[in-house]
């Protein structure tokens, strides 16, 4: 499938985004409070605060911890990590993968609003396509609809 024109692809580490200004690193979290596999390992190696904030959020501190919600953590000046809850549990249920596309759409709409306010670009791995079991064709369509179509620059990193 041909990549969407609003998504740029790069080889590199999504935890080290290439940006001239404000940037948001987005990734998918599950709705059961689990953190420790997948892209979050790379995040935790760079910064402790996204995991700490996620665990506090799951414990009931802050906005509701539910599918479609997003938590923004500033990890460096002009750099945020967006913990997006778009994965139901960590295992397939009834043959369905853990990713929830509608929750991803809702979360990305919140990311778009945040990025518009901060004049930030978005950086990510191929979210939702590893442990969450999603299909990149579907995920990239949602990314394009919710971010690219709203003028938000998106870079997807493939780790070398």
Task: Give the location of each predicted region.
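Macrodomain-like recognition of ADP-ribose-binding/processing modules
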Residues: 1-160
């Amino acid at each position: 499938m041909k990549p969407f024109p609003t998504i740029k692809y790069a080889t590199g580490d999504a935890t080290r985004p290439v940006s001239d200004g404000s940037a948001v690193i987005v990734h998918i979290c599950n709705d059961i409070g689990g953190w420790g596999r997948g892209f979050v390992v790379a995040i935790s190696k760079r910064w402790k605060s996204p995991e700490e904030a996620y665990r506090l959020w799951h414990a009931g501190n802050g906005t509701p911890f539910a599918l479609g919600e997003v938590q923004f953590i500033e990890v460096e000046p002009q750099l945020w990590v967006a913990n997006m809850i778009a994965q139901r549990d960590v295992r397939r249920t009834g043959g369905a993968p853990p990713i929830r596309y509608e929750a991803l759409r809702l979360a990305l709409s919140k990311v778009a609003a945040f990025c518009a306010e901060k004049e930030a670009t978005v950086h990510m791995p191929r979210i939702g396509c590893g442990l969450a079991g999603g299909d990149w064709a579907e995920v990239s369509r949602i990314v394009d609809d919710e971010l690219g179509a709203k003028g938000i620059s998106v870079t997807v990193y493939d780790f070398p």
